[in-house]
Curated annotation (Swiss-Prot):
Chain ranges passing through the membrane: 274-294, 301-321
Topological type in the membrane: Multi-pass membrane protein
Catalysed reactions, as listed in the record: Zn(2+)(out) + H(+)(out) = Zn(2+)(in) + H(+)(in)
Topological domain spans for side Cytoplasmic: 1-273, 322-327
Compartment(s): Cell inner membrane
Name of the protein described by the UniProt record: Zinc transport protein ZntB
GO molecular function terms listed in the Swiss-Prot or TrEMBL record: cobalt ion binding; cobalt ion transmembrane transporter activity; magnesium ion binding; magnesium ion transmembrane transporter activity; zinc ion transmembrane transporter activity
Record keywords: Cell inner membrane, Cell membrane, Ion transport, Membrane, Transmembrane, Transmembrane helix, Transport, Zinc
Family: Belongs to the CorA metal ion transporter (MIT) (TC 1.A.35) family.
CDD domains per UniProt: ZntB-like_1 (cd12833)
Length: 327
């Protein structure tokens, strides 16, 4: 396989273009650098930038059927072998504070043993971990270890978000035990986040498993073993998501039951109040519509006696309800 010159991957508006030094570090790519399997290149692009879009559409370093995928037309996690290279689409947690974490960010990459091209539109937060290791000189030394480190960082961020959702569910369950109902829409949003994670992380787990089983020339047995460990770890996260989705269904039923019981208690209370005041309401209405005049209206103690009668009547009804165990 021929070496690539640094000038062949010179993209002015690239997010960064680095040359791996083979010892865990990087240096900025220069035009006179030689790119080979011992010193692979990592070119990271935002495919919406004009120079990056033109380079993706015109460079002879990429197969024709890879260009559209790197330009944003592939969204679900997948892996495809393209001759000597491999096209991979992955999803990561959104680190933007203006958007929800479950609005996952897509990262697309094409790589072989000497050349890595990764593209994105929104920032891929998990790449910061890999970039930090490379800048400190403790990062990947070749393309195989780079891919393993990237997948490991993506899985770490996904696992952290799954753990956050799990903690929210535990808090929600504790509040329900205290008869505290969550705000409207809270449980629906939580369930949606779990379903979105399940939708994209399941095929991503399959991508990891396939990378672990594929005999890619630039991945060693140790790389494949680590990739299988990452796939297993994400699989355990998916099991946790499935359990959380089931628990949200149970909590939805519990919330509906709590609200129904609360409504039943209020209805029962209003019914008892109506039963207590119904006799007194009947008497006051009867006296008020008496066409021949209100009985005792001319007696100065008539109103007082009527009030005492109402109090006794209400007390009698209340006592009867209490003895009947309605109160």
């Amino acid at each position: 396989m021929e070496a690539i010159k640094g000038s062949d991957v010179n993209v002015p508006d690239a997010v960064f273009a680095w040359l791996l030094d083979g010892r865990g570090g990087v240096k900025p790519l220069e035009d006179n650098d030689v790119i080979d399997s011992q010193h692979p290149c990592w070119l990271h692009l935002n495919y919406t930038h004009p120079d990056s879009a033109r380079w993706l559409a015109s460079t002879p370093l990429l197969p024709n059927n890879v260009r559209d995928a790197l330009a944003g037309e592939s969204s679900r996690p997948r892996v495809s072998r393209m001759g000597e290279g491999t096209l991979i689409t992955l999803r990561c947690i959104n680190g933007s504070t203006d958007e929800r974490p479950d609005q996952l960010v897509a990262m697309r990459l094409y790589m072989d043993e000497r050349f890595i091209v990764s593209t994105r539109q929104r920032k891929v937060l998990a790449l910061d971990d890999v970039v930090s290791d490379l800048q400190e000189g403790t990062g990947p030394v070749d393309c195989g270890s780079w891919l393993v480190d990237v997948c490991d960082a993506l899985t770490d961020h996904a696992s952290e978000f799954i753990e956050e959702l799990h903690d929210k569910i535990i808090d929600l369950e504790d509040n329900l035990l205290d008869q505290q109902i969550p705000p409207r829409g809270f449980l629906a949003l939580l369930r949606k986040q779990l379903i979105v994670m399940r939708r994209y992380m399941a095929p991503q787990r399959d991508v990891y498993a396939r990378l672990a089983s594929e005999r890619l020339p630039w991945m060693s047995d140790d790389h494949r073993r680590r990739m299988q460990d990452i796939a297993d770890r994400l699989g355990r996260g998916l099991d946790e998501i499935d359990a959380c989705i089931a628990r949200t269904g149970i909590m939805a039923d519990e919330i509906a039951q709590v609200m129904q019981e609360s409504l039943a208690r209020r209805t029962y209370t209003m019914s008892l109040m109506a039963m207590v005041f119904l006799p007194s309401t009947f008497l006051t209405g009867l006296f008020g519509v008496n066409l021949g005049g209100i009985p005792g209206g001319g007696w100065r103690f008539g109103f007082s006696l009527f009030c005492i009668l109402l109090v006794v009547l209400i007390g009698g009804v209340t006592l009867w309800l209490h003895r009947s165990k309605w109160l």
